[in-house]
A protein has these predicted regions:
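Formylglycine-dependent sulfatase
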Residues: 2-3, 22-400, 409-430, 444, ...
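C-terminal helical cap and adjacent loop that interface with cofactors, partners, or active-site loops
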Residues: 406
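Short, charged, surface-exposed hinge/linker loops at domain edges
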Residues: 445-458
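Bacterial N-terminal signal peptides
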Residues: 8-18
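A short N-terminal helical cap/helix-turn-helix that marks the beginning
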Residues: 436, 443-444
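Loop/helix patches that line or flank the sugar-binding groove of alpha-linked glycan CAZymes
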Residues: 430-434, 450-451
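Positively charged n-region of N-terminal signal peptides that target proteins for export
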Residues: 1-9
């Protein structure tokens, strides 16, 4: 027997949804003329911190680098999960996906949000803003929502572009950029030499891996081209100096051991906030920010009171400083899993609930889309992976992981068995356990009908993809590697 979402929410600590009204108001650092400013979110899809302004000296992102120089740049924005639909459901509500029952990706039988929870678009419309979600062109074309709850575009948004508003009406707009989501695209204007790319040590130094990485960076460069067009349009419309701009990603890199997982490359994404008056332009913040904090800050900039239930915090306020960010993994398409993690500035603790399943339990999207995944399967079977690469491909995963992010930024050396880190392990284990008890609906198993629907859909996609690629239905990893080598290295 499955419990209804509202009953589950009651069983959870309801206190998380209704913050004590007597809590002191956050003091705002910035006090803009909120009645004069529009607000724009530019959201990239699957974007890691692989930009020039974040230290990558190979990628050509001069427009985003210029935007960063005019913005406050945040180094430590982490998404609550590393896949699009739960992440997007969170940053449109300011809530953890596991608190409001939107944690699974994707859900075939979507439900309404709990009665008390509203997308922030509702608060902006009630405040008189014109609310849009588009692709940044004046054609008014609607853009991706990808929310894991029942939501019609017309109920949340009034148009695809801000130019449809009444004269002088303020707007809260989103522009969705598909890139650098797979499939990657070539940037013929600024191609990247695969021999020059710097791969993380947990990837094999193989021509196929380097080519895939180079194409990822080239696709990021196309994001850069798209962003400058949006900024140019704002300027031509006389709106650039009247609009607060947020630029961020819905999660991190679309790569092995990144997207869908709790390591930093999957959850760490750029965040820039540009103010019309040049407030703190060119400054860098290393404070921890969760992407559920973005809607809270956005409401504050508009002078709209944050609803008491919202878990996100206004990271623009002086008294905001997160000690931790929390991230989570649940079912991803047909792949059932449960991982929770807590991160401080120095350490990360990961709890794996399904230790009987490998990290790489089958997922059709990744197996068919990531050239590096079948490559690493093959190299694992042939004994060609090193100590940094092998653990993620193994049939075993530990119940707990602990990483010193200052000494080990690639999260390779698990410290759970080292006596000198026992106190840190106990502390973060306790922090995460308390957070789970207070916030996490994922303790309740998902309806099997939903899981079956996801698995059937994945099976259909698997068959269609192999047929399109003219591969047998029982194609081996060796055959998939050969396919990708023909596609990426020989054309």
């Amino acid at each position: 027997m499955t419990l209804s979402l509202n009953i589950k929410l009651y069983i959870l600590s309801i206190g998380v949804l209704f913050v004590n009204a007597s809590k002191a108001q956050e003091k705002q650092i910035l006090n803009p003329k909120t009645t004069d400013y529009n607000i724009l979110w530019i959201v990239a899809d699957d974007l890691g911190t692989d930009l020039g302004c974040y230290g990558n000296d190979l990628v050509y992102t001069h427009n985003l680098d210029r935007l960063a120089s005019e913005s406050v740049l945040y180094k430590n924005l982490f998404t609550v999960t590393a896949v699009c639909s739960p992440s997007r459901s969170s940053f449109i509500t300011g809530m953890y996906p596991v608190t409001i029952g939107v944690e699974q990706h994707r859900t075939r039988f979507k439900k309404q949000l709990p009665d008390s929870i509203k997308p922030i678009t509702e608060y902006f419309k009630n405040a008189g803003y014109f609310v849009t979600n588009g692709q940044g062109n004046k054609g008014d074309k609607e853009a991706k929502m990808d929310y894991n709850f029942n939501a019609e575009f017309k109920d949340l948004y009034q148009a695809g572009h801000w130019n449809k508003r009444a004269k002088a009406q303020k707007f809260f707009s989103q522009v969705q950029l598909f890139y650098p989501h797979r499939p990657f695209q070539k940037d013929t204007a600024n191609p990247i030499d695969p021999d020059l790319v710097k791969l993380p040590p947990y990837y094999p130094n193989h021509p196929l891996a380097r080519k895939d990485w180079a194409l990822y960076l080239e696709t990021i460069q196309l994001v850069d081209v798209r962003v400058v067009k949006i900024l140019k349009q704002l300027k031509e419309d006389g709106l650039l100096d009247k609009t607060i701009i947020f630029f961020f990603g819905d999660q991190g890199r679309p790569h092995v051991r990144a997207k869908q997982f709790m390591y930093d490359p999957g959850t760490n994404t750029p965040l820039m906030v540009r103010y019309p008056d040049g407030y703190k332009a060119g400054t860098i913040s290393k404070e921890l920010v969760s992407n559920i904090d973005i809607p809270a800050a956005t409401l504050a900039l508009a002078g709209i009171k944050k609803p008491s239930y919202m878990q996100g915090r206004n990271f623009l306020s002086e008294d905001h400083e997160r000690a931790y960010v929390f991230t989570m993994r649940d079912r991803r398409d047909e792949t059932v899993d449960r991982i929770r993690a807590v991160r401080s500035k120095k350490f990360k603790y990961i709890k794996n609930y399904y230790t009987d399943r490998p990290y790489t339990q089958y997922n059709n999207y990744k197996e068919m889309s990531y050239p590096m995944l079948p490559l690493m399967h093959v190299m694992f079977e042939e004994g060609k992976l090193n100590d940094a690469q092998r653990p993620f491909m193994d049939s075993y995963r530990p119940a707990e992981e602990l990483y010193d992010l200052e000494k080990d930024p690639f999260e390779i050396n698990n410290l759970t068995e080292t006596p000198e880190h026992e106190l840190e392990l106990e502390k973060l284990r306790s922090v995460l356990n308390k957070w789970v008890q207070k916030n996490d609906l994922g303790v309740y198993p998902e309806n099997q009908i939903e899981i079956n629907a996801a698995q059937n859909k994945a099976s259909e996609r698997h068959k269609k993809t192999l047929k399109k690629r003219k591969l047998p239905q029982n194609a081996t990893y060796w055959q998939l590697v050969e396919y990708w080598e023909n596609e990426l290295l020989k054309k």
